[in-house]
Design a protein with these regions (language model features):
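Extracytoplasmic cell-surface/polysaccharide-interacting catalytic and binding patches
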Residues: 32-130, 145-242
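Sec-dependent N-terminal signal peptides of Gram-positive bacterial secreted proteins and lipoproteins
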Residues: 12-27
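Positively charged n-region of N-terminal signal peptides that target proteins for export
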Residues: 2-12
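Extracytoplasmic/periplasmic soluble domains downstream of a signal peptide or transmembrane helix
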Residues: 136-140, 183-185
Length: 242
């Protein structure tokens, strides 16, 4: 059945009113949700952030060792070269004398060695350690292998100064670690080892004299028979490393 124009108009108005009412309620709901969201956001923003009090950590202050304490040279002179000959077979005995590969000295002696190192660096060199603290047990082993007081201190009559932790056997190298010409190698028992320097090259003699000058100014005394051997002028008792 066909509807009249009047009825069609009536139907159209009803649909329009329903659509309007529906849009009104949807818009109103959206506004309410927006208000709620804004309210929640404002509450979050308004909530004060709790203050965080920074925790202060007391820095660890290491107590300076006493002069008589044995310390690792590398802990204080990190750029020194360590080449302990008695910890290898590269020595006159051909055997390992002690197992430790750590160069140790009395703290008081180490400070003087540090001074020598700083002076040498100004001149383009640095120290190379061949031997430092030597346990008295190692001295007995050396004497057992070579019982000659000309070359090895007799531990039955008095220990080597190395066993006191205040003596080093050293040479110098360039700042890049390259070898420098010196009178002889380590544990050389010829006349080249003494401090006469008349039977070595001019360059070797001058380098040895430079080392001697720097070490003496730092507070060390050299041994006439070995250009590489230096002892702290301050004495310490014999030390046994257990």
């Amino acid at each position: 059945m066909l509807l009249s124009g009047k009825e069609n108009m009536k139907k159209f108005l009803i649909i329009t009113v329903l659509a309007f009412v529906s849009c009104f309620f949807m818009t109103n709901n959206m506004q309410e949700e927006t208000k709620e969201n804004v309210k929640d956001f404002e509450e979050v923003v308004a909530t004060p952030t709790p203050e965080v009090t920074p925790t202060y950590v007391e820095p660890e202050i290491k107590e300076e060792p006493k002069d008589e304490e044995l310390v690792k040279i590398l802990d204080y002179i990190p750029d020194v070269v360590i080449d302990l000959k008695y910890a290898t077979e590269e020595n006159f005995t051909g055997v390992v004398i002690y197992e430790s590969d750590e160069a140790l000295l009395r703290y008081g002696t180490m400070k003087k060695l540090e001074k020598a190192q700083e002076e040498l660096k100004k001149l383009g060199y640095k120290l190379c350690i061949w031997d430092a603290f030597r346990p008295k047990e190692a001295q007995f082993k050396l004497w057992e292998i070579c019982p000659n007081p000309i070359y090895v201190a007799n531990p039955n009559k008095g220990f080597s100064k190395h066993s006191r932790g205040n003596t080093v056997d050293i040479t110098i190298v360039s700042l890049s670690g390259e070898k420098v010409e010196m009178p002889s190698g380590f544990d050389d028992f010829t006349k080249k080892a003494d401090r006469d320097y008349s039977d070595v090259s001019k360059e070797a003699g001058e380098n040895a004299k430079l080392l001697e000058k720097v070490m003496e100014e730092a507070g060390f005394k050299g041994y006439a028979g070995e250009w590489w051997h230096y002892s702290d002028e301050k004495e310490y008792p014999v030390f046994s490393q257990d």
